[in-house]
Amino acid sequence: MLPVAASRCLWGPRLGLRGAALRLARQQMPSVCAARQLRSSSHRRSEALAGAPLDNAPKEYPPKIQQLVQDIASLTLLEISDLNELLKKTLKIQDVGLMPMGGMVPGPVSAAAPASEAAEEEDVPKQKERTHFTVRLTEAKPVDKVKLIKEIKNYVQGINLVQAKKLVESLPQEIKANVAKAEAEKIKAALEAVGGTVVLE
């Protein structure tokens, strides 16, 4: 082996500068190896991928959503109706009519068609009188509430006193649908006699 001084002479001044530059670069570089950095960043990526749900794995829902679903599932039909109505009001959702069957899209109508339709609409009310009605309770006097609840229980099939009370507390409510005119007027008179305000639709 050659002594250190001799090896420096063999390398020459250029190689000595390169060596100094390499040493300086090593001092300025972070102490972490590039290969180690690659391994750790790929490890982080694999952790992120491992945490992501797979397509065939069941989705995990937050506890807040699970509790909300359980609460909605435990509601009665009257409460669901109220929830639906309140959500429509809160979110400003308008009722949408049914789509016509067969993919028919309403389009522009000629000027002659509205005139003939108007004539038909005038004839229909003259020829046909309504025979069936929906009895709807719109208001209840607080004083006569107990009598009204008992009377509603008589006219609504399959309802108990607790359900009748909830019905009276969440007005307006439909009492009976598709009822003959005579029976609808009888129900209206009975409910108004015990303090209810009834509308026939």
From Swiss-Prot:
UniProt keyword list: Acetylation, Isopeptide bond, Mitochondrion, Ribonucleoprotein, Ribosomal protein, Transit peptide, Ubl conjugation
Keyword Repeat appears in the UniProt entry: no
Residues modified to N6-succinyllysine: 153, 165, 181
Protein name per UniProt: Large ribosomal subunit protein bL12m
Post-translational modification: Two mature forms are produced by differential two-step proteolytic cleavage. Cleaved by the mitochondrial processing protease to produce the long mature form and subsequently by the mitochondrial intermediate protease to produce the short mature form.
InterPro entries: Ribosomal_bL12, Ribosomal_bL12_C, Ribosomal_bL12_C/ClpS-like, Ribosomal_bL12_oligo, Ribosomal_bL12_oligo_N_sf
Pfam families, A to Z: Ribosomal_L12, Ribosomal_L12_N
Cross-link Glycyl lysine isopeptide (Lys-Gly) (interchain with G-Cter in ubiquitin) per UniProt, renumbered positions: 153
One Gene Ontology molecular-function label: structural constituent of ribosome
Family named by the database record: Belongs to the bacterial ribosomal protein bL12 family.
